[in-house]
Amino acid sequence: MNNFVITVDGPSGVGKGTLSAALANKLGFALLDSGAIYRISALAALRQGIAFDDEDELAKLIPTLAIEFISNNDEVTAILNGENVTTQIRSAEAGQNASKIAIFPKVRAALLQRQRDFSSPMGLIADGRDMGTIVFPDAQVKFFLEASAEERTKRRVKQLQEKGFNANFGEILAEIKTRDLRDRTRAVVPLVPAKDALLLDSTHLSIEEVISQALAHIAKFKKF
């Protein structure tokens, strides 16, 4: 792999998206939001009436979708077939649906090469859960972000409320813990850090502090 790739992995709510968008803007790199691809695919399946347990039909659907990401400051706009679906894919339900389809090998296979195709001569920030272990195992720089379930719940509640969604702390905390258990124990590509990833715990750090630590680490591998 000749193109410079930086992977940012970790569970939901740790700040992967914000860090990835910030790094893409500061470094002038392209951006891949892997989690959004799964959410977009689940949304498309829902709209077309495809069941979330129909592995074959889900795998057939994915290659037909036109997906792109537009990074603006610390925000990422997700586009599906020319439509801005950012708001639709950020709901709690969309996240649950994405985890449901992510367990299927054929679905992951259908998306794997597509994600690798995001690699760019300008450089790439790849945000996801298995970017450093499966999608870009040879990436030059790898991060794995962590944060407590309680802190992630606080962030998620605030995010949902700011977007106009109802949010219950207890329900979201339970959902996060359930997703964590499912993602870490699933048979196909469980959520684990790459062996050569730098672990960043953002529980008690501001996003500015996380970005600063990430940039300092990246500078060890690439001069800008």
UniProtKB/Swiss-Prot annotation:
It is found in: Cytoplasm. InterPro entries: Cytidylate_kin, Cytidylate_kinase_dom, P-loop_NTPase. CDD domains: CMPK. SUPFAM superfamilies: P-loop containing nucleoside triphosphate hydrolases. It comes from the Bacteria. ATP binds at residues 10-18. The keyword Transferase applies. GO terms for biological process: pyrimidine nucleotide metabolic process. GO terms for cellular component: cytoplasm. It catalyses: CMP + ATP = CDP + ADP; dCMP + ATP = dCDP + ADP. Its main location: cytoplasm. GO terms for molecular function: ATP binding; CMP kinase activity; dCMP kinase activity. Pfam families: Cytidylate_kin. Its EC number is 2.7.4.25. Keywords: ATP-binding, Cytoplasm, Kinase, Nucleotide-binding, Transferase. NCBIfam families: cmk. Belongs to the cytidylate kinase family. Type 1 subfamily. This is Cytidylate kinase. It comes from Haemophilus ducreyi (strain 35000HP / ATCC 700724). The gene is cmk.
